[in-house]
Amino acid sequence: MRGGAMFSAVEPVDLRLSPGELLVIRGRSGSGKSTLLSMMAGILAPTEGAVLIGGEDLYALPDAAASALRNERIGVIPQGHTALRSLSVLENVLLPSIIRARVEQEGVRERAEVLLEGVDLAPLADARPDELSGGELRRMAVARALVMRPETVLADEPTAGLDAGNAQTALRMLRRAADEGAAVLVVTHEDEAVHFADRVMVMESGVLRLGDALRGGSPACEDLN
């Protein structure tokens, strides 16, 4: 509700994320882009419609099955800073592996270490989250979302609080994930992500407008290893 009246945060939309594609949705604060991402991530149930992942309606599943589907197929970079303070930076990045299998899976630690190197956090692997700056926490969240090589990556303002160099690094990692076959969605109010996109859409007052295909103009990804 707003001012005592009902309103739609997101108007009806039919949106498809394709494997190997990086889609950017741009919009101002309050435009509805983060609400849309939250619905796609299984965080906020829509009042109407469905979110289909591999043909399964995420919100029609029992809670345990929906949670398993999210953990297995979706990597989320949430808005703000999310970390377990009792764990080290490396352990936070490894969390998706532990949540999925109850134990750390083989090979995941090595990938986590590579990702931390990619976001320039390797020297802080043993640090606690409260020792990190806001920008460092954002970069940790990028590594955590990618550690299990999810089929779908949903990134809410992934470059918020990052300087230009670190923003480029985060976006290159998301671009690499798309090039390796993931369907990647970035919602942002900033311009930089557009240069890494295959497709750009604009959201305003809950309405999603079609944009252009841009892959030909996206910068080449540098090797992160």
Model-derived regions, located:
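Helix-to-loop junction immediately C-terminal to a conserved catalytic motif
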Residues: A41
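ABC ATPase NBD coupling module
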Residues: L58-G75
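Conserved ABC ATPase signature
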Residues: R128-L132, E136
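Conserved catalytic motifs of ABC-family nucleotide-binding domains
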Residues: R149
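Conserved ABC transporter NBD signature motif
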Residues: G49-D57
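Conserved ABC ATPase "signature" region
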Residues: D57, E106-P123
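Catalytic Walker B motif of ABC-type/P-loop ATPase nucleotide-binding domains
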Residues: V153-D156
